[in-house]
Amino acid sequence: MAEEKKLGLPSVIATGVGLIVATSCLLSIGQGASILGTPFIITMAIACAFNILTALSICELNALMPNLTGGLAQFTLASCGPFITIITNMGGFICCQLILGSSEAAMFGNTLCEVLPSIPVTPAMWSIGLVIILFVLNLFGVDMFAKIQNIVAYGLIGSLVVLGILGCIKINPAAVVDQPSVLIHNYSETFSLLGLAFFLFIGVEFIVPISPNVKNSRKIVPWGMVLSLVIILVMQILMVLGFKNITSWEELGKSTVPHILYGSLLLGKAGTIWMSVVSMLAVISTLNTSIFGVSQLCAGMAKIGLLPAFFLKKTPAGSPYFGMILVAAVISIINATGLSSSDSLVFLIMTGCTFWIFCYIMVHVDVIMLRFKLPKAPRTFKLPFGILIPILGVIGNAFMICNIDPDMKNKMTIYGIFGGVSVVLAVYAFFWCKLKIKRPLFKPYAIKEVMAMDTDLYQIRHYPNLAKKLHLEAQPDVTPLSADTNTGTRPEE
């Protein structure tokens, strides 16, 4: 049988770039540039550097425990125990994806209202309608949008690069505006928007699941992660420079769809249509990924005993529908409250980012804890300089949380939401650990147990009632050979 073709560095980079970029990132670029001007490039570069440190830590964790389906939850389970794992992953990924998915849906509604102003439909109605359609479609299977997902994402990226370059070279002299490049008095103010810039680079960890299909993954996966982030940074720098030449900072700050504003000013109606079509397809693709991805994450955490078993229930097509119901309901409720202004959208994004940054802090903590716990365990990829990189990562991510929003009132509100949700999750985690799984709160699981959790045998042994409901059976993977098969223990005749 022919050997399965392995992925190379270009495929890994393409996957990483396609997964990280979303249309709500464009709002963040526009908001950051309208506040700082071109110095926002410095802010983006700092945030990119911190995210590169996180990517490298994720690579070491994946090298120690490869091919896990529970996401970063299983790494934390092996380093800090179930209590911290539940809080981190439910807050850092599930809650965050619900919040950021809501902002993507809102961008879809705002885009349609911008390009179709004559239709008397509110942005919330467009957004909720899209969520309902994607929810129904996802119930029918995993690969509903798989064939166009990457094409759409790469189309958005290519469009932004081209538009950024056209703006930089001032291809339309009539559209050029005369305005200052720098809007701040002190370059220390660039730190004030680190939280906003962080959002532009999240999601690089989603490269990890494809690592088994990558040739020489020990070297290519880390390089792919780093280069994905650098390529995105270059694309965003081009957009900021284009904004400076074409769009007034004031208009940019007010717009909820800055990419469409920029496209229309640069290329007229053609630019509006171009960016509208590409961005709406990208929103659909990203939101579809969010709906299915969160449901899969919930199912993965349920499989390792950290969430109720009903998250494992699937439709005949194999879709975990309880998680999908949760995602669709929460996103619809958030959008029903109204997300028409750029300020409310940015606030929503910053709130979600706080949870995600906290989860990234735990990634670095996991590396440090496992370095001390298992110093001699084999790792196909190991960070240089001991624990220096994860320590810098913890400091950098904590610094971004401290600078999550330049407005102190908004910052305190975000902290309040983060703290309130964390308390609720802590109460759930305490009772779940004590009453349901009956495990010590802070005692790490053995790595061999964490890696065994993905197998049906583990579920049958530890959760027999659940295994019975899921119709799991322990079947041998090896097919008996016929008596005349030569296994290499005797010479050929």
Where are these regions (language model features)?
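Terminal cytosolic tails of multi-pass membrane transporters
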Residues: 1-6, 364-386, 410-493
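Helix-loop-helix junctions that connect adjacent transmembrane segments
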Residues: 2-4, 41, 116-125, 150-276
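Hydrophobic transmembrane alpha-helices that form the core helical bundles
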Residues: 31-34, 43, 52-131, 135-139, ...
